[in-house]
Amino acid sequence: MITKAIYPGTFDPITNGHLDLVTRASAMFSHVILAIADSSSKKPMFTLDERVALAKKVTALLKNVEVLGFSELMAEFAKKHNANILVRGLRSVSDFEYEWQLANMNRHLMPKLESVFLMPSEKWSFISSSLVKEVARHGGDITPFLPKPVTKALLAKLA
Protein backbone atom coordinates (compact mmCIF):
# COMPACT_ATOMS: atom_id res chain seq x y z
CA MET A 1 0.00 0.00 0.00
CA ILE A 2 1.32 3.42 -0.94
CA THR A 3 1.02 5.96 1.83
CA LYS A 4 1.30 9.53 0.68
CA ALA A 5 1.94 12.16 3.34
CA ILE A 6 2.25 15.92 3.20
CA TYR A 7 4.58 17.90 5.44
CA PRO A 8 3.32 21.48 5.05
CA GLY A 9 4.86 24.70 6.26
CA THR A 10 6.22 28.08 5.29
CA PHE A 11 9.86 26.96 5.56
CA ASP A 12 11.17 30.54 5.54
CA PRO A 13 13.84 29.23 5.48
CA ILE A 14 14.01 25.46 5.85
CA THR A 15 16.04 24.56 8.97
CA ASN A 16 17.86 21.47 10.18
CA GLY A 17 14.81 20.84 12.36
CA HIS A 18 12.57 20.74 9.29
CA LEU A 19 15.09 18.54 7.51
CA ASP A 20 15.12 16.16 10.48
CA LEU A 21 11.33 15.81 10.36
CA VAL A 22 11.08 15.34 6.59
CA THR A 23 13.86 12.74 6.72
CA ARG A 24 12.06 10.83 9.45
CA ALA A 25 8.73 11.13 7.61
CA SER A 26 10.36 9.80 4.44
CA ALA A 27 11.27 6.63 6.35
CA MET A 28 7.67 6.23 7.56
CA PHE A 29 5.71 6.87 4.36
CA SER A 30 6.01 5.75 0.73
CA HIS A 31 5.89 9.30 -0.62
CA VAL A 32 6.22 12.63 1.17
CA ILE A 33 5.32 16.00 -0.29
CA LEU A 34 7.15 18.86 1.38
CA ALA A 35 4.45 21.45 0.73
CA ILE A 36 5.64 25.03 0.95
CA ALA A 37 2.91 27.56 1.64
CA ASP A 38 2.85 30.82 -0.27
CA SER A 39 1.98 32.56 3.03
CA SER A 40 2.18 36.07 1.65
CA SER A 41 0.31 37.27 4.76
CA LYS A 42 3.34 36.24 6.85
CA LYS A 43 5.62 38.45 4.71
CA PRO A 44 8.30 35.81 4.17
CA MET A 45 11.93 36.82 3.64
CA PHE A 46 12.31 34.38 0.75
CA THR A 47 9.92 34.18 -2.19
CA LEU A 48 7.95 31.00 -2.70
CA ASP A 49 10.18 30.06 -5.64
CA GLU A 50 13.32 30.61 -3.53
CA ARG A 51 11.95 28.50 -0.67
CA VAL A 52 10.99 25.70 -3.08
CA ALA A 53 14.44 25.79 -4.70
CA LEU A 54 16.25 25.69 -1.34
CA ALA A 55 14.07 22.82 -0.11
CA LYS A 56 14.65 20.86 -3.32
CA LYS A 57 18.40 21.35 -2.94
CA VAL A 58 18.56 20.12 0.67
CA THR A 59 16.16 17.17 0.18
CA ALA A 60 17.68 15.96 -3.10
CA LEU A 61 19.00 12.75 -1.52
CA LEU A 62 15.56 11.82 -0.18
CA LYS A 63 14.25 10.00 -3.25
CA ASN A 64 10.65 9.68 -2.02
CA VAL A 65 10.34 13.38 -1.15
CA GLU A 66 8.77 15.82 -3.59
CA VAL A 67 8.83 19.59 -2.99
CA LEU A 68 5.86 21.67 -4.15
CA GLY A 69 4.57 25.16 -3.46
CA PHE A 70 0.89 25.76 -2.74
CA SER A 71 -1.54 28.57 -1.98
CA GLU A 72 -4.87 26.77 -1.53
CA LEU A 73 -6.37 25.28 1.62
CA MET A 74 -4.36 22.30 2.84
CA ALA A 75 -7.40 20.02 2.55
CA GLU A 76 -7.79 20.99 -1.11
CA PHE A 77 -4.08 20.47 -1.75
CA ALA A 78 -4.26 17.04 -0.09
CA LYS A 79 -7.27 16.03 -2.22
CA LYS A 80 -5.55 17.20 -5.40
CA HIS A 81 -2.48 15.09 -4.58
CA ASN A 82 -4.37 12.04 -3.26
CA ALA A 83 -2.77 12.32 0.17
CA ASN A 84 -4.57 11.57 3.40
CA ILE A 85 -1.83 12.14 5.99
CA LEU A 86 -0.43 15.43 7.25
CA VAL A 87 2.88 15.39 9.10
CA ARG A 88 3.37 18.17 11.62
CA GLY A 89 6.10 18.90 14.12
CA LEU A 90 5.40 19.62 17.77
CA ARG A 91 8.11 21.48 19.67
CA SER A 92 6.09 22.58 22.68
CA VAL A 93 2.73 22.59 24.42
CA SER A 94 1.89 25.88 22.72
CA ASP A 95 2.47 24.22 19.33
CA PHE A 96 0.01 21.49 20.32
CA GLU A 97 -2.89 23.88 20.90
CA TYR A 98 -2.50 25.48 17.47
CA GLU A 99 -1.91 22.13 15.74
CA TRP A 100 -4.97 20.62 17.45
CA GLN A 101 -7.13 23.40 15.98
CA LEU A 102 -5.60 22.93 12.52
CA ALA A 103 -6.01 19.15 12.64
CA ASN A 104 -9.68 19.43 13.56
CA MET A 105 -10.37 22.04 10.88
CA ASN A 106 -8.60 19.93 8.25
CA ARG A 107 -10.56 16.86 9.35
CA HIS A 108 -13.78 18.89 9.07
CA LEU A 109 -12.84 19.96 5.52
CA MET A 110 -11.58 16.49 4.53
CA PRO A 111 -12.75 13.74 6.93
CA LYS A 112 -10.15 11.21 5.76
CA LEU A 113 -7.23 13.60 6.33
CA GLU A 114 -5.28 12.44 9.39
CA SER A 115 -2.63 14.46 11.19
CA VAL A 116 0.49 12.70 12.45
CA PHE A 117 2.62 14.61 14.93
CA LEU A 118 6.36 14.11 15.22
CA MET A 119 8.50 15.42 18.04
CA PRO A 120 11.71 17.03 16.83
CA SER A 121 15.03 15.55 17.79
CA GLU A 122 16.07 17.15 21.06
CA LYS A 123 18.89 19.16 19.51
CA TRP A 124 16.42 20.88 17.16
CA SER A 125 13.52 21.29 19.59
CA PHE A 126 14.10 25.02 20.15
CA ILE A 127 14.80 25.98 16.53
CA SER A 128 12.38 27.97 14.40
CA SER A 129 12.90 29.82 11.14
CA SER A 130 11.93 33.08 12.85
CA LEU A 131 14.46 32.60 15.63
CA VAL A 132 17.24 31.72 13.19
CA LYS A 133 16.49 34.82 11.09
CA GLU A 134 16.59 36.99 14.21
CA VAL A 135 19.96 35.55 15.26
CA ALA A 136 21.29 36.14 11.72
CA ARG A 137 20.05 39.75 11.68
CA HIS A 138 22.11 40.39 14.81
CA GLY A 139 25.26 38.76 13.47
CA GLY A 140 25.01 35.52 15.45
CA ASP A 141 26.29 32.18 14.19
CA ILE A 142 23.47 30.36 12.40
CA THR A 143 25.57 27.60 10.83
CA PRO A 144 24.53 24.92 13.37
CA PHE A 145 20.85 25.43 12.57
CA LEU A 146 20.63 25.49 8.77
CA PRO A 147 21.85 23.33 5.90
CA LYS A 148 24.87 24.99 4.22
CA PRO A 149 23.04 26.18 1.06
CA VAL A 150 20.35 27.77 3.23
CA THR A 151 22.91 29.51 5.45
CA LYS A 152 24.55 30.94 2.33
CA ALA A 153 21.19 32.13 0.93
CA LEU A 154 20.10 33.70 4.22
CA LEU A 155 23.38 35.56 4.70
CA ALA A 156 23.17 36.80 1.09
CA LYS A 157 19.62 38.11 1.75
CA LEU A 158 20.85 40.03 4.76
CA ALA A 159 23.96 41.47 3.06
Curated annotation (Swiss-Prot):
Q: Name one GO cellular component term.
A: cytoplasm
Give the EC number. 2.7.7.3
Name the pathway: Cofactor biosynthesis; coenzyme A biosynthesis; CoA from (R)-pantothenate: step 4/5
Question: What GO terms describe the biological role, i.e. biological process, of this protein?
Answer: coenzyme A biosynthetic process
Its main subcellular localisation, reduced to a broad class, is cytoplasm
Which residues take part in binding substrate? 10, 42, 74, 88
Compartments it resides in: Cytoplasm
Q: Does the keyword Cytoplasm apply?
A: yes
Reactions catalysed, semicolon-separated, are: (R)-4'-phosphopantetheine + ATP + H(+) = 3'-dephospho-CoA + diphosphate
Question: Could you confirm whether the keyword Heme appears in this record?
Answer: no
| Keywords, sorted A to Z | ATP-binding, Coenzyme A biosynthesis, Cytoplasm, Magnesium, Nucleotide-binding, Nucleotidyltransferase, Transferase
Q: What does this protein do?
A: Reversibly transfers an adenylyl group from ATP to 4'-phosphopantetheine, yielding dephospho-CoA (dPCoA) and pyrophosphate.
Query: What name does this protein carry?
Result: Phosphopantetheine adenylyltransferase
- Which organism does this record belong to? Yersinia pseudotuberculosis serotype I (strain IP32953)
**Which gene name belongs to this protein?**
coaD
